[in-house]
Amino acid sequence: MIAEERIREKVYRLKATYALRSVSILGSYAEGRATENSDIDLLVEFEQPTVSLLKLNSLKYDLEDTLGIPIDVIHAPLPAGSMIRPSKIVRIL
């Protein structure tokens, strides 16, 4: 399991590159039940409301390369009626 502070540091280093407005952790990492097999679920809001799939995937792969763990990047804000309903959100940026 990766410490929240390490995730925060890596995300902060990519803030300018990807024009990140906010990043939050969801899922097992946010709920404190992550295991060594868990991925990291990130809810990401960009400075621009519209972001290309290429940019989302680039962010995902940059984070996976630096953290060495699978990452799921979810574009924020979540739309009304979204199937994703996190029980806990931990803002890291």
Q: Would you name each region that the model predicts?
A:
Residues 43-45:
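Short hydrophobic/aromatic beta-strand micro-patches
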Residues 1-22, 30-36, 47-93:
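Catalytic core of pol beta-like nucleotidyltransferases
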Residues 25:
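Conserved histidines in hydrophobic membrane contexts and catalytic metal-binding motifs
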Residues 39-41:
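Structural signature of the urease/amidohydrolase superfamily beta/alpha-barrel
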